[in-house]
Structures are given as C-alpha cells and as structure tokens.
Amino acid sequence: MRQYSVPARFSVDERDNVAAMVFEHERDDPDHIIYQRQIDGIWTDITCAEAARHIRSAALGLIALGVQAGDRVSIFSATCYEWAILDLAILAVGAVTVPIYETSSAEQVRWVLQNSEAVLAFAETDAHAAMIAELTGDLPALRRVLVINGSGPKALEQLAEEGGSVDRAELTARLDALRSSDPATLIYTSGTTGRPKGCQLTHSNLLHEIRGTQECLPTLLTPGQRLLVFLPLAHVLARALTLSAFASKVTVGFTSDIKNLLPLFAVFKPTVVVSVPRVFEKVYNTAEQNASNDGKGAIFKLAAQTAVDWSRAWDDGRPGLLLRAKHALFDRLVYHKLRAALGGDCHAAVSGGAPLGARLGHFYRGVGLTIYEGYGLTETSAAVTVNQIDALKIGTVGKLVPGNSLRIADDGELLVRGGVVFSGYWRNEQATDEAFTDGWFRTGDLGAIDDDGFLSITGRKKELIVTAGGKNVAPAVLEDQLRAHPLISQAMVVGDAKPFIGALITIDPEAFGGWKQRNSKADHAAVRDLAEDPDLVAEVDAAVKEANLAVSHAESIRKFRILHVDFTEDTGELTPTMKVKRNVVAEKFSVEIEAIYTKD
C-alpha cells in the first residue's frame, strides 16, 4: 500500500473559526470591495464593512429568533448574495448551515429538514416556502421559515428587525465560545445511489480547506482577482472556494442565471471561475457546433488541435516556430473570441466534481484559460488534491492539499485522512464505520499516483462493471470520451454480468438542430424520430469508435442505443451537479439495456 503526505505550513488553532475573518476584514480593510451583488440588474459594490454589517445584522436576528449554538439552520436557495451572508451569519452564532439545492424535490427537502432537525429554514422564493409549508407536519423541530426573495418581507430585512434589540455583546460571546472542532455545516450527499447522508464538517475542516487552497493557488486567491460563482452554493466545491476567496479578499459575484451567463461575464468580467467539467464541455461543444453551423467547422477543428498542441508543447519545453505562428493566427481568428465571451479578463478556472479530461484541459490552456483541476468529495470539504500554480499537470487532479495524506489500497481505492476529512455521517454510525478503516476515509474512488506525485482518478469502485467474462471495466473513461462529442449529451456504460460492454447515449438538444440542418433532416423531427436514422447512428458510432481507442478491446463498447430523451435533473436521472444516477437510469431504461443484449 503506497502512502503520500504533504505537511501544512499553516496551523488551525483551537479557538479559530470561519466567521472570524468577516470582522477581521471589517477592522483591517473596511473599504475593500469584497462582493458585488446584482440590484435591479446592476452589479453593485459591497465593501468589507458593508458585508460585515449585513452578516452581523443577520446573526443578531438569528439570536433573537432563538437559534442556539449547534442548532441546524437550512438554506433552500439558488446561488445568490444572500446565501453567502446567511451562511456566515449562521456560522457566527455557532449554528450549523444545512444547504438544500434549490431544485430539490419535496421528498428530498423533507428528508434533509427532518433528518437534520433544522429549527429554521430560509427559502429562496414563495414557491420554495410553500413546498416547506406542505411538509411541516413531518418537521416537528422546524419553528419558522423566512423567505429570501419573495413577495413579502425579505429574510435579511426581517432578521435586521428581529435583531435590532439584541446587544452586540451577545454575538461577541457566541464568537468567543466557538471552537475549531465545533460543527459548521451539515451537507447531504447528492445521492447517486441510495438516500443522501449528512456529512458533518467542522470549522477546522473548512479552515484547513481555506488555508490549504490558499497555499496551492496563491495568485488566484489574492486581492484584485474577481471570482464569478454560478455553481450551486449547496455544492461543497462552490461553497469552499467562495469561503477561500472571501478569506483572501477576492471580489466575489454570484448568479444562478446559467442561461444568461455570457452577458453576465461581459459585465462582471471575472478573472477566475469555478465550475464542473460538464460546463466546460458544453462551452467547447457549443463553440464547435456554432462554427460547423456557420460553415467554419474545419477552421475550428484546426484551431482546437493547435491549442492542444500548443499547451502540450509547453509541457515538453516550448512551442516551435511553426506552432507559434499557427497559434498566433488562430488567436486572431478564434481564441480571442472565446476569451471575449468570458468577459475578456478570465485567465483561470477551478474545476472539480468529475474528470475534466486531458484534451479539454489542454484546449483551454491553449486558448488562454488555465483550468486547475482538483479532486475531492463532500466528505473532504471539497478538494483534497488540486493542480497548483507551481505544480500543474493537465490530465491529473493534482497533488495533495497541504495538511493531508493519501493511500492507495491494493485494489486501487483511494484512502485519505487529514485536516479536510470529515468526522462522520450525521446520526449514522453504521455508515461512518463502513466509511473508515483505521482512521482512513475510504473514498470509493480508484486512482493512481505518478512519480511526480500527481493523482489520476481511474474510476469509481462502486461503478466498476464486471462482465460475464470477469473483466473489470471502469465506465468513466468511456463516458468522458463520449460526452466530449458535440452531439452527445450524456452516456452511461452498461454490461454488468453481460457478455460485452454496451452504452446508452442521449443527444444534446442544443446541438441537434444544427446537425439536422447540416444533414438535411426535417426541422420538426425529434430524436425519437431519428434514433435509428443511419446518419445519426453513424455519427454516434464514430464517437463510440473514438472512445474505444482509450481502452482495451475487452473494455470497448460493442453496441449502443440512442435514447429518445435526454437525462435531466428534473426527470431524475442527474444530480444537481450533473452526475448520472446510474441506478435510476438502469431502472428507467431497463428495456433499452436488455435490447442491447438481444440478438438482432
């Protein structure tokens, strides 16, 4: 069993807590612009002093409402300025933030609020509040629901009014009583299989994440940088990086308006973004599709290959004269347009949650956007490894965040321990016992470390497919390759206890229209009408053959089915971070899976 450790050059003391930085910034740099928030569509500056005032006001309101240290308080909302303020206010009074994705179903909301025994909930809209109201009979601990942005009084205004009579000394006493070992947040896993479990993270866990990522990404996490957060703050990656940015006095903006990101980029002009790989895949695929629709597909493919070659050349030394000339040409024709679409100043991104893929990483670096890919789980407070400013290897998930250790078991499973690793699942001793071996957290992921200390994720242990012939196949390699094709939205590899590997494939609805036009298909034709069309099947078959080049013959996809519908979060096949719920898909499309193994 191989073991690796990176010591921390920082410390987390017993009396440290996450909320203290709010009031340190207020004291040391009150006029620094720490946030920008949208007010009536206009980005408005929020200084450290103003943010602290809002957080203090909300915290005093929580005290007035009877929230005690250790109480669970839920935020059921999309990403917004108020989310960040409420989170820090909850932490400041010693309570525990319980995030809920704004897209969660009533049953998911019921489970989280009931299991956590939340005493107070913040609902983003009237509709979110109404959903909770329908569940109150099952939620005896829940005392009140405040609405962040509804038709009635706003939550922050209500808290300010409630807390107006509370002495500031009460908040000071709460802060003084906090210990780094105290719980800070209870985050429920997104649940690709089974019922979500509550991961308890302490102030110490979050501070190790904040300070560790500051060491790894010092030039990104520094005053003067501008971070646009559009991932759900209920996701540990977005939350942790937002806290790291706040600690580093990066100016942070929030939006949940994913459909209108490009106009927001143009106005906010981020220097850094945080996202999951599917977003980077979609940006690339959309650019390729648009170029193809305009008759410039060949130019884009040449430009993309040149960007990849350029990035790889820097790993090997430096680009040659011809490659530099090609890169300069495509920079004028293609790359500058992509950078402009991101606001013109964006030079870096942080990616996690799923594998990015080496080709995509090289493409973006060749265009001028370096993606620092990391690896982690909710149970590790987000990143436990990450590519770093002075240690970057595209195609890997980087090196250990300082203050942590990593083991690779004999079967390839990654085991971790250290400052970012959680202490256990909320009120679930059995799951906690199963998750740890001799103090090491079993991630369930498979990986390998190269001679330079960079980690690569090779698959998910629970997702390993064992064919009838006994071949172990990690589906992620094939699925990532397939999703890289602009026409493919999602792919799920199947074949457990079957004679060969197959795949279910969905078509990207945004790319489908352009494909129909280029291939002289009827505009009104749906995927179900063309699922067996020879041209569509041939296009997908080419993508499958390309993906198969990444694996051995025994692991390759022999047959596939094009599904009539795409996977979505609304219809239950995807988690909020766009991971496929394999058990849901297997059950819902069992007939299609069996058809793969039926002789034609």
UniProtKB/Swiss-Prot annotation:
Pathway field of the UniProt record reads: Lipid metabolism; fatty acid biosynthesis
Give the encoding gene's name. Answer: fadD15
Q: Which UniProt keywords apply?
A: ATP-binding, Fatty acid metabolism, Ligase, Lipid metabolism, Nucleotide-binding
Q: What class of enzyme is it?
A: ligase
What this protein is called in its record is Long-chain-fatty-acid--CoA ligase FadD15
Q: Name one GO biological process term.
A: fatty acid biosynthetic process
The reaction(s) catalysed by this protein are:
a long-chain fatty acid + ATP + CoA = a long-chain fatty acyl-CoA + AMP + diphosphate
Which InterPro entries does the entry link to? AMP-bd_C_sf (IPR045851), AMP-binding_CS (IPR020845), AMP-dep_synth/lig_dom (IPR000873), ANL_N_sf (IPR042099)
Instruction: Drop me one GO molecular function for this one.
Output: long-chain fatty acid-CoA ligase activity
Q: What does this protein do?
A: Catalyzes the activation of long-chain fatty acids as acyl-coenzyme A (acyl-CoA), which are then transferred to the multifunctional polyketide synthase (PKS) type III for further chain extension.
The text of the family note is: Belongs to the ATP-dependent AMP-binding enzyme family.
In which organism is this protein found?
Mycobacterium marinum (strain ATCC BAA-535 / M)
- A GO cellular-component term linked to this record: membrane
- Per the UniProt entry, the Enzyme Commission number(s) are 6.2.1.3
